A protein has these predicted regions:
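Gram-negative bacterial Sec-dependent N-terminal signal peptides
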Residues: 1-14
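Signal-peptide-cleaved, periplasmic/extracellular N-terminal interaction regions immediately downstream
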Residues: 12-135, 139
Length: 512
């Protein structure tokens, strides 16, 4: 299940293992009294079809793929008889609607599917378990197929819950243990998944990479952000190592060079200001079960004596996750004034992500921000709101999705210096961005590109927003990431078009 795990882990739109037919929810479901129906699905060339059936579900495995359009046409013809249809390059799962039963048979390269009323018996079952294939084995294959379908549709937690009792019943079944490891990795329990890979002696590239990542990492990155009035160059070096199964600790250092056309200071308006900032970080991640984790951070801006702490809690599986954010005076150089005089930020926020369908994901976050400078408390307060949706409408290569993002901040208090200038001048901002996103894999590389438009409702600085990113494995222990683009999304204290470029090289420390 290497590709299955890989599809779940990619943050950008990936190439999912299984495709899903879109069904019409407005069609009236069939009643048990309706007559039986038979539909055919014909492969364009010779194929070997292996069927596994239950009263309400059919799993078909094949050695030649079938075109998506033919499966979508089959789903349309089935209409209200069909509850679910999912497929990949070598299997498909057909589930009957409520009040219906299902049976299937294979004749050469033709699959014949019968939809029957609940009360009607199946005349001639297509699959009778033989002594070589006991009923328990058939049931096991069906349950594994269900787990694979759930995982490929973007529900790794649901798949893991199916697999856990199977792993307890069949502890020596390496296929089940491998699938369970894939789900643990997809949910973020990397150490648990890597441990399971070692126990079954998995040696494929995906497993080796996961085992390498589980041992910690050292990462170096450089970022350039440029705008009309404010630009920054940032270098980062950090390391993270596991201490047991549920705890990882790390440390890092950041150096930022900032250049601002104008800065509001205690002596008036400063021009062409260049500032250098060095920040040291201490990090810890606590894994709480399979689906939750707590991230802790302590940071110090050593040249300005600004210190702070923060925490983020992620609760729940990726398909239904809640987030809580708390920060107290963490060093912050997001605005010209903060980068010049030593800035900090305090935050309290909450948010979440939910997958409504295999294609549609919603997310929303909101919170309070307090911006301050060295030697002072909060000088500017705001309420920040962000959210969006992702809709994946093409699963084959390249994958295609449309996205919407809201990025807004509403300032409710700004304190002034004795000279009448604000300590940190911020204004309301509300950005609405729409993008088309494409993703494609080449060998060891995943490339994602996005292009669209941002509407600035308050600042009226509408413009393009586009980016391209590439992530690749140089080998099992090294990863290279590069991304760049243009953004018209206004940031705190900065509006207008901005360019950015980021390159990161990561060395993973785990053994495999």
């Amino acid at each position: 299940m290497t590709m299955l795990g890989a599809a779940l882990l990619l943050a950008s739109p990936s190439l999912p293992v299984l495709s899903v037919a879109m069904l019409d929810d407005e069609v009236t479901q069939p009643s048990p009294g309706q007559e039986a129906r038979a539909l055919s699905l014909v492969w364009p060339s010779d194929v070997k079809l292996v069927l596994e059936t239950s009263p309400y579900e059919v799993v078909v495995r094949f050695d030649r793929p079938i075109k998506d359009a033919m499966l979508q046409a089959f789903a349309k013809d089935a209409g209200a008889d069909l509850a679910d249809l999912r497929w990949n390059d070598n299997s498909l799962v057909i589930r009957a609607a409520s009040g219906r039963r299902i049976d299937a048979s294979a004749q050469g390269r033709t699959l014949i599917v019968h939809f029957l009323p609940e009360s009607q018996d199946v005349a001639a079952p297509s699959l009778t378990p033989s002594p070589a294939t006991p009923a328990s084995d058939t049931e096991l294959e069906l349950e594994i197929a269900r787990a694979e379908a759930d995982a490929a549709a973007g529900y790794p937690d649901r798949a893991r819950r199916r697999l856990v009792p199977l792993a307890e019943r069949y502890p020596d079944n390496k296929r089940i243990q491998r699938l369970l490891g894939d789900m643990e990795v997809a949910e973020g329990a990397l150490v648990l998944g890597a441990t399971r890979y070692r126990e079954i002696a998995a040696d494929d590239p995906f497993a080796r990479q996961a085992m390498a990542e589980a041992g910690g990492n050292i990462m170096a990155a450089g970022t350039i952000r440029g705008g009309k009035v404010f630009s920054q160059v940032e270098g980062v070096l950090n390391a993270l190592v596991p201490v047991g199964r549920n705890l990882a600790v790390g440390a890092g250092v950041r150096h930022v060079r900032s250049k601002a056309d104008t800065v509001l200071g205690p002596t008036g308006i400063l021009t062409d200001v260049v500032a250098h900032t060095t920040i040291a970080d201490a990090l810890a991640t606590v894994q709480i079960g399979n689906t939750s984790r707590l991230e802790l951070q302590g940071s110090a801006q050593v040249d300005e004596k600004v210190y702070g702490v923060g925490a983020r809690l992620f609760a729940g599986a990726p398909e239904r996750q809640a987030r809580v954010l708390l920060a107290y005076r963490l060093p912050d150089v997001a605005t010209p004034e903060q980068s010049t005089f030593g800035g900090h930020i305090s935050r309290a926020g909450i948010g979440g992500t939910i997958r409504l369908t295999p294609e549609l994901v919603l997310q929303a976050d909101g919170g309070w921000n307090g911006y301050g400078l060295r030697g002072t408390g909060v000088r500017t307060r705001s309420i920040a709101v962000s959210g969006g949706l992702d809709y994946l409408f093409r699963r084959s290569s390249p994958s295609l999705a449309i996205t919407y993002r809201l990025d807004a901040e509403y300032v409710n208090r700004t304190r002034l210096r004795p000279n009448g200038l604000p300590f940190i001048p911020l204004s309301d901002r509300e950005n609405h961005s729409f993008q088309l996103v494409a993703g494609k894999s080449w060998s060891k590389w995943q490339v994602t590109g996005a292009a669209g438009w941002t509407f600035d409702r308050i600042g009226n600085t509408n413009g393009p927003t586009a980016n391209i990113s590439a992530t690749g494995r140089l080998n099992d222990g090294w990863r290279l990431q590069a991304s760049g683009g243009v953004s018209s999304i206004s940031r705190p204290g900065i509006s207008g078009r901005q360019l950015y470029l980021r390159v990161a090289l990561t060395r993973y420390l785990g053994r495999f």
